[in-house]
Amino acid sequence: MEPAERAGGRDPLEPGGRPGPDPQGFVPQKEIVYNKLLPYAERLDAESDLQLAQIKSNLGRAVQLQELWPGGLFWTRKLSTYHRLYGRKFSKEDHVLFIKLLYELVSIPKLEISMMQGFARLLINLLKKKELLSRDDLELPWRPLYDMVERILYSKTEHLGLNWFPNSVENVLKTLVKSCRPYFPADATAEMLEEWRPLMCPFDVTMQKAITYFEIFLPTSLPPELHHKGFKLWFDELIGLWVSVQNLPQWEGQLVNLFARLATDNIGYIDWDPYVPKVFTRILRSLNLPVGSSQVLVPRFLTNAYDIGHAVVWITAMMGGPSKLVQKHLAGLFNSITSFYHPSNNGRWLNKLMKLLQRLPNSVVRRLHRERYKKPSWLTPVPDSHKLTDQDVTDFVQCIIQPVLLAMFSKTGSLEAAQALQNLALMRPELVIPPVLERTYPALETLTEPHQLTATLSCVIGVARSLVSGGRWFPEGPTHMLPLLMRALPGVDPNDFSKCMITFQFIATFSTLVPLVDCSSVLQERNDLTEVERELCSATAEFEDFVLQFMDRCFGLIESSTLEQTREETETEKMTHLESLVELGLSSTFSTILTQCSKEIFMVALQKVFNFSISHIFETRVAGRMVADMCRAAVKCCPEESLKLFVPHCCGVITQLTMNDDVLNEEELDKELLWNLQLLSEITRVDGKKLLLYREQLVKILQRTLHLTCKQGYTLSCNLLHHLLRSTTLIYPTEYCSVPGGFDKPPSEYFPIKDWGKPGDLWNLGIQWHVPSSEEVAFAFYLLDSFLQPELIKLQRCGDGELEMSRDDVLQSLTIVHNCLIGSGNLLPPLKGEPVTNLVPSMVSLEETKLYTGLEYEIDLSRENYRETIARVIRKLLNHILNNSEDDTKSLFLIIKIIGDLLQFQGSHKHEFDSRWKSFNLVKKSMENRLHGKKQHIRALLIDRVMLQHELRTLTVEGCEYKKIHQEMIRDLLRLSTSSYSQVRNKAQQTFFAALGAYNFCCRDIIPLVLGFLRPDRQDVTQQQFKGALYCLLGNHSGVCLANLHDWDCIVQTWPAIVSSGLSQAMSLEKPSIVRLFDDLAEKIHRQYETIGLDFTVSKSCVGIAELLQQSKNPSINQTMLSSEEIKEGLKRQQGRNVDALRNYENLVNTLLDGVEQRNLPWKFEHIGIGLLSLLLRDDRVLPLRAIRFFVENLNHDAIVVRKMAISAVAGILKQLKRTHKKLTISPYEISGYPKPTQIVAGDRPDNHWLHYDSKSIPRTKKEWESSCFVEKTHWGYYTWPQNMVVYAGVEEQPKLGRSREDLTEAEQIIFDHFSDPKFVEQLITFLSLEDRKGKDKFNPRRFCLFKGIFRNFDDAFLPVLKPHLERLVADSHESTQRCVAEIIAGLIRGSKHWTFEKVEKLWELLCPLLRTALSNITVETYNDWGTCIATSCESRDPRKLHWLFELLLESPLSGEGGSFVDACRLYVLQGGLAQQEWRVPELLHRLLKYLEPKLTQVYKNVRERIGSVLTYIFMIDVSLPNTAPTASPRVPEFTARILEKLKPLMDVDEEIQNHVMEENGIGEEDERTQGIKLLKTILKWLMASAGRSFSTAVAEQLQLLPLFFKIAPVENDNSYDELKRDAKLCLSLMSQGLLYPHQVPLVLQVLNQTARSSSWHARYTVLTYLQTMVFYNLFIFLNNEDAVKDIRWLVISLLEDEQLEVREMAATTLSGLLQCNFLTMDSPMQIHFEQLCKTKLPKKRKRDPGFVGDTIPSAELVKRHAGVLGLGACVLSSPYDVPTWMPQLLMNLSAHLNDPQPIEMTVKKTLSNFRRTHHDNWQEHKQQFTDDQLLVLTDLLVSPCYYA
């Protein structure tokens, strides 16, 4: 079936296009091309037109009638299915209408969340191919999406349990925004910036929110003429922000994602060059590689690191263009990290490195595809100036190939490397494939390292296609194929599973790509061949040999895997998992080889496999299956020749062996008989037409063997029957050869070498289909009449009780029935019958769609409809068995299978289809060509895809009409699911779940039946039935969960039933399995529940589009437009639905309450019921009063679980009852009296100064309070003011406070009564101050919300009752009482937000003494809770309202009362409050700093640490971000200047600083130096604390402290050091990892140079360790500055000549590291310099006195000479994994110094020993670099005794 016609003028590679004037009247957007290749393709247009017309008409109707459910959902689901079956086969106009309609539906504000998700997923699919619709075709607004994201992802009520969203909702929404983004209007960018800029306050969580919104919403694909309305509005601002942030806050990674997207969408329109060094430095830092001698990682560097995927996209998009800067840096990046890829390295960072390797080539290939091969569309093309040139591609491949080759052998496996190589080989095969082969050939030879073999083979598989197709860049590629294949054969090894599997994959891959045809004869006939072609021709003579050797290997494998005798005895019919994988590998590889063979080679192979199979007798479990598979593969390739050999032989043997009738009744059959039956049953799985010749013989065999007594025998015979039926009735391709028409052509016409590696041509695929002929159908029915009919008659009589059958006979009959059913599933039409009506009311037709799958079901009434007959008989039999012999489980298992297949099976099983689809995708991925695209897959793969398309159609069953017959069978399954045997139940339940998913609305019919088993009033339910019913409710992991259908009608029944089932007599909590079931049920309901809608209103805009959709022509069905009556009726029904929903909701709540309040309900069920009730809290309805009362009473329940649920619930109820507060719009500029700034200035400006805390003007009187304009949210005004700035209106306009009981609503009265009752409150407080889990309890936000709600809704009504409790609790220092009072106080302070001034003032009169007491009673266990309490109290509150609190906390935090610990705690609590206030309290921060500064010399360690942390927060606001005004809060430079003044005494001293301070306050004045050391300790704590927290590091200021730290830091790792030294070391480690700005580099180097001249060798040593980390973590920033590189080089080389040995050695280590990461290069001046030093003459040895041990100070000459040797040694060690050209000579030079005095001799030995260690692995390779003489010297050195000395 070839699509002959192609539309004129279309690109021939784009299938589609109909000839001439379009018969369908529309041009499809983009069809699934594979449909055109199906054998029945000509029928599909009419079919799809009809379906599309129905969808448009009915979906339009449903929406106009406001019927979202069931009509709307039903037809949107149909649209999804349509999309899966035909692609986007609709006109552009319809496409736009569908999108607009779904967009409107998705954005209905009160839409139920599960519907929203359904619509959103469909909309995402419709928007997926953005090239199909341009911005002119479609425009979508952005605000509805923003409202939705805000409402759902930033929900204000979700945390209170008033809304339940599924976990998937975040991804769905983000993808939806991403899909709509290209279509946002041109002005969207400006509107978005206006909306979200005000959130950009870097100290606040809102910053994260702003950047998230920018990342997901900002459109970046606008055309160039609109760039001024797009990214140009924000690029400089955001990139400026990114460049200046130093400490990796969470949102930095999101900015990177945004820039990556921007860069990809606008290649060539943005100049990235100024940022390139910074980008690469940050990406390198993001890999978190371990560097330097001692490293401590900042934890947030790990958690907030960039996503490698996005970083890669960014790099790829910046490549190319005139400057080549990116390529230079990329090469630098790989140079610096290559050695980390070496297989000997491993760590948590390795995954990132591997991902980088895998993603980069992939990303470059995608870019090349887009620039060179992709069809142009409306999206902006890349300008020619910036397209990647061939040179760019070559440079890229060269810079990445080294690490990729190293990664082949990585510890994590070779997958990433193989994927990288696949993409690299597409671009530059000549650079990539040779080195891979160089590693592969030795790996194929090695016997000791099998992992090398698996790694190299999987990489060669990746490059196979590029290798075989050769092409002009790599013409010699194909010549490697045969040598590789021959060498791979030994890999078929029975003793090594993984080697075996990869070898199979390898051989299969290559043979798929190449016709195995011997072309050597062509050499004589033609003389126009190229050199390579001649070589290939002569090589192909080996193909036959290869095929035969492969077969011998397989035979060996089979013979070694024969079942051992021991296993033969047991009834294991299954192979082990590994055996079945080998079987699969073997059979698919062999079948691939035979498919690709020439006829000559095939005949030889056929004969060989035939001889092997008849000369042995195999057991049928393992070896037999493998041989039979090989035979089947042979027969499939050439049925005629093969069947001639096999069928007569097998039939003969079987007939011979069954001559004697005794055989029929034997329990154990002859092995030979079984083996031949097995063989025969497998070789009949071939083209049905070819089998017809042998039908008489085959039928005879069936007659002889179907009724054998031996189960193994008749099972094989049934297989034969099954395969005969399948072969004759199914539609399938009969060959998968790589070239259409096969290779059987004379060499003169056809030259196979031209077809090596050739892709299939979609247009001339020439699939050979097997379509059942009438003769075959007749034969199939003949088989059914002969073999199925008699069994059905027997079973029918057995079911009626007329015929006694033994169990074995029943099983045999059922086996025959089952095999007939699955053999002819395609022939038998689906079950027909009456539909089950009245399940759901709908005004739209809910009809099922019929798909044509290649067979007309015969109207021929003479033929029995066996599906219905089987159904009838099996149901009768089932009934009989369940009533009379329920323990016949084997028969029941089969009956379950039969029922499942009767319902669903039409020729293929879903799970098999899914796994084939998966493996199709894997093969596609492993061999696809992403560079050229255009579906250039090999032919076999394309055929497979068309076949999958056919199967997809046969499996499209969802949305089937639910008929009476289905109902009966599902009820049978339910009966089996609740029967006595657990295995029967389990199997029945799986089939039951599958059936429930297939039929529309059948769940509603079945639920009452399932719940029947749980009813407490039934006495006849057994425990097994009870358990079975619970499992039926629970569902399996993929299917429907009956307990939790998102539908009021259903959960109104199921939830109460689950709770009341606790009273059923079948329920027993003694049985752990039942307890576990209830736990699972409750857990699953909680996990899957999503808030169900109460309001199903459809917006006007939806209805308008729906009308257009219904009127849309081409295609359309004649359906009349809706009358106004219908529309009225629709509206009425929709209002009815809202009323019903509400009634159901209240019903459910009441029924659950009835259930929970039953007298003797076990506690477990009470808990489950309360849990379900708490799911029913909503934000659009207040809970019914009875439930409110229930929850409030349960605050004092005996069980803590219940109390916890009640606390959450009451907090939620209080939120429901919250009264709205009125807001007004203000103008901040008028209030401040300053005009609006002309450009953006963030931070402290005149127009936001009035928000600051100012003790001179805080509102202390009622008048001042009421005239103040309070702004509660801390971020407003920092960056910019919002367009519409709202604040709360004055007190008199707000809801009334101080209400009496009469003023309250009923719901409020319930709460009021309980909380005014002293007894109730006392009990509550007692419970709340109990300990829950010792040592694990923390401040509980739920309880805080409860109290906040109480004081917000009822202001101070309950204070009188609570006051005595608070006073009592505060005085009690127990952990749990303190925590309780902290929670209440936080709730009080936050709840008093809208109180009047008098009430607030009275509140603080009460609170201040309480807090003073509390802070003096603070303990180790509670300081965290008080910190949380104060932080929570200050969060999002105007600081001017809290002045009492701040003044209290600042009274004198370090009074010393209560000891140092209480001081530290007070500071902690204060810090919590101030940190929440961020930038709005500069005055308080200044006061605090002034107070702390004199106390920085505090002796106590805990206070010092706390002060350090407080300083971090004080200076947090001093940020160096762009467009930010200098801060009014304290600034670091001024502070540092004052500190340095005090540290002067330490700076001037040059010797080591020892820590002489004892940890106690000495008496009298301490000297300046001791004071200085104490100060220094605190400063260290401050610097360490701020390393991970602040946004920018004040480098200039810290630098002045560096020399001091260098002096203190210890050199060795020793934990016994005092705190000062440890801290100095840690602080240096953290500082060295800091990100530097380019202008800071010279400052740092200046300090390092100065310290390198210090007299303390500790300082000189530490300079080097600092340098190692600093350079690596700022690599490209330094490389970008030539002077800096020179300075560093000079610094390290000069320290090589230090008088102190340790410093010299560290300098050598540093040099070697800098060389290794390619920061410095080993050039000749350096080499000459070291060689000169080496030649320094040493002074003559003096005669020594016997008592004289040796020179203490080495002579200057010795130091110089040692420096030279160290330098050379550093060069050698800088290449641990290879041998550069200069190395052999250096090693020779070094060896000359083996006899020098110490420490030189030691250095040489160390160097040689390290060289040997690192180069030992690949010594064979490295040896090549040395001359013979050098090798002699070297071998001598490496093994000579002196080496071991």
From Swiss-Prot:
One GO process term, biological-process aspect: proteasomal ubiquitin-independent protein catabolic process
Positions of region (Bromodomain-like (BRDL)): 1652-1740
Any single Gene Ontology cellular-component annotation: nuclear speck
Alphabetical keyword list: Cytoplasm, Developmental protein, Differentiation, DNA damage, DNA repair, Nucleus, Phosphoprotein, Proteasome, Repeat, Spermatogenesis
Reported modifications of this chain: Phosphorylated.
Entry annotated with the keyword Zinc-finger: no
Free-text comment on this protein's domains from its UniProt entry: The bromodomain-like (BRDL) region specifically recognizes and binds acetylated histones.
Function summary: Associated component of the proteasome that specifically recognizes acetylated histones and promotes ATP- and ubiquitin-independent degradation of core histones during spermatogenesis and DNA damage response. Recognizes and binds acetylated histones via its bromodomain-like (BRDL) region and activates the proteasome by opening the gated channel for substrate entry. Binds to the core proteasome via its C-terminus, which occupies the same binding sites as the proteasomal ATPases, opening the closed structure of the proteasome via an active gating mechanism.
PANTHER family reported for this sequence: PROTEASOME ACTIVATOR COMPLEX SUBUNIT 4
Protein's UniProt name: Proteasome activator complex subunit 4
Annotated organism of origin: Bos taurus (Bovine)
